[in-house]
Amino acid sequence: LNEYDLILESESACYIKIDHGFEKALETLKPGGYLLVSDYFVYFRDGTKNPHLKSSHDKEKYLNSARAHGFELIREFDQTENTMPTLDYGKYFIDRFINPAMEYGIYSSKKNYPKTAAIIEKMIAPKIESKLNQLELIDSDQFRKYRQYMIYLFQKKDV
């Protein structure tokens, strides 16, 4: 194979099994080819079930696997602080607009249609609770505690 000069994993590394991803990159990159990765990685675990720990690769495991598969880390850049304003704005938007609209809708439906509201609440309450728990994912302080948004440039070593 060895057809490509560059493979770009832009916010997709977390969906690829670590070793399998590096094996495929080895197969498809030309000698001296590059693997450019931009994604968030877990660097701290505290034994909790925080949602930040679920959908990211462990940073050290990822870097160790890269080395083990013959990739040299050429450059790395911690992009975390540059991405936090997006999370902060998302949280602001939900707190300022979405939550008040939902609260008013719930209040109004309970006041005007109590029986219907009770049935609907019973049906969707667990799903809403699950989604509310995911709001920790846009808490920039929680993100900083567990993850780093990293950009890595690897080069396939000539073997």
Predicted regions and their residues:
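Substrate-binding/catalytic lobe of Class I Rossmann-like enzymes that use SAM or dcSAM, i.e.
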Residues: 49-141
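Catalytic P-loop NTPase motifs of RecA-like helicase/translocase cores
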Residues: 15-16, 44
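A short acidic, Gly/Pro-enriched loop at the edge of an enzyme's catalytic core
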Residues: 1-7
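Residues lining the SAM
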Residues: 10-13, 38
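Active-site beta-strand termini and strand-to-loop segments that position acidic
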Residues: 154-157
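A short glycine-rich, Lys/Arg-flanked "PGG" loop and its adjoining helix->strand segment in the class I
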Residues: 19-34
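Conserved beta-strand signature within the Rossmann-like core of class I S-adenosyl-L-methionine
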Residues: 32-40, 44
